[in-house]
Amino acid sequence: MNAHNAALGGTPQRLKRGIPLALRGVARRFGEREVLKDIDLLVPAGQFVAIVGRSGCGKSTLLRLLAGLDQPSRGELLAGSAALAEAREDTRLMFQDSRLLPWKRVIDNVGLGLRGDWRAKARQALRAVGLAERANEWPAALSGGQKQRVALARALIHEPRLLLLDEPLGALDALTRIEMQQLIEGLWREHGFTVLLVTHDVSEAVAVADRVILIEDGEIGLDLPVELPRPRSRGSARLAALEAEVLNRVLAQPELPPQPEPVSPLPTQLRWAL
């Protein structure tokens, strides 16, 4: 079994360390409004970070900067000592919408953009997310949770070192959401990539992350380590206390108007839809 196959379908291996991230004085302005204000942040390789905050606080803007879908007004985005732009091939982004192409079968969506003999790898990626038997079906036959599993398989086939998650579970029912949280956490523990998850769900953040970052009016208002053993018991008093600490801070902040959505060049938009 080769290294790629082992990563997706065989004995768990941490084949690649995640990407270490450094943000230095990162800001983003839209007209007169500064959505992000001189963000300084260090994320060690392989850490699972959840980013929470009220609508309009700047958390999705931050993820777009990390994905290369937008550019900062000032500041630096680094992967280790190099520019983050140099790590684009090792970075994948998942959205709330699975963005599957309805005219392509499931396996073809997973292998989208790949060349050569990719079908075996695509099947292994589908096996890793529990959908090997749905490979030849159309996306229309899948539930919302299954579509997100396909989107996750599409990311896994590229062996990402940095996985960016922009509310990927927001449209799912509660039970499916928990199942997907457990799947993502399990794959992260197996492969060791760095994860940044943007979510409105504070309970989700403290359940899966090593660290919860609260964005308040474009600044880091809280940086909370979640030092609890895994797998975590969702009914535990410690988890509830951490959730309450974050929620109390979030609820103390006023709701902000949504920031404008920047339009990236078409090739970049297409790249992250794949």
From Swiss-Prot:
Catalytic activity: ATP + H2O + aliphatic sulfonate-[sulfonate-binding protein]Side 1 = ADP + phosphate + aliphatic sulfonateSide 2 + [sulfonate-binding protein]Side 1
Keywords tagged on the record: ATP-binding, Cell inner membrane, Cell membrane, Membrane, Nucleotide-binding, Translocase, Transport
Gene3D superfamilies recorded: P-loop containing nucleotide triphosphate hydrolases (3.40.50.300)
Domain ABC transporter intervals: 21-242
Top enzyme category: translocase
GO annotation, cellular component aspect: plasma membrane
Domain of life according to the entry: Bacteria
EC code(s) of this entry: 7.6.2.14
Gene Ontology terms, MF aspect: ATP binding; ATP hydrolysis activity
Binding site for ATP: 53-60
The keyword Plastid appears for this protein: no
PROSITE patterns linked: ABC_TRANSPORTER_1, ABC_TRANSPORTER_2, SSUB
Topological relation to the membrane, as annotated: Peripheral membrane protein
Record's subcellular location: Cell inner membrane
One Pfam family in the UniProt entry: ABC_tran
InterPro entries for the chain: AAA+_ATPase (IPR003593), ABC_transporter-like_ATP-bd (IPR003439), ABC_transporter-like_CS (IPR017871), ABC_transporter_ATP-bind (IPR050166), P-loop_NTPase (IPR027417)
Stated family: Belongs to the ABC transporter superfamily. Aliphatic sulfonates importer (TC 3.A.1.17.2) family.
Summary of the function given for this chain in its UniProt record: Part of the ABC transporter complex SsuABC involved in aliphatic sulfonates import. Responsible for energy coupling to the transport system.
Record PANTHER family: ALIPHATIC SULFONATES IMPORT ATP-BINDING PROTEIN SSUB (PTHR42788:SF17), TAURINE IMPORT ATP-BINDING PROTEIN-RELATED (PTHR42788)
Summary of subunit composition and partner proteins: The complex is composed of two ATP-binding proteins (SsuB), two transmembrane proteins (SsuC) and a solute-binding protein (SsuA).
Protein name as annotated: Aliphatic sulfonates import ATP-binding protein SsuB 2
Source organism of the structure: Pseudomonas aeruginosa (strain UCBPP-PA14)
Organism classification: Bacteria, Pseudomonadati, Pseudomonadota, Gammaproteobacteria, Pseudomonadales
Recorded name of the encoding gene: ssuB2
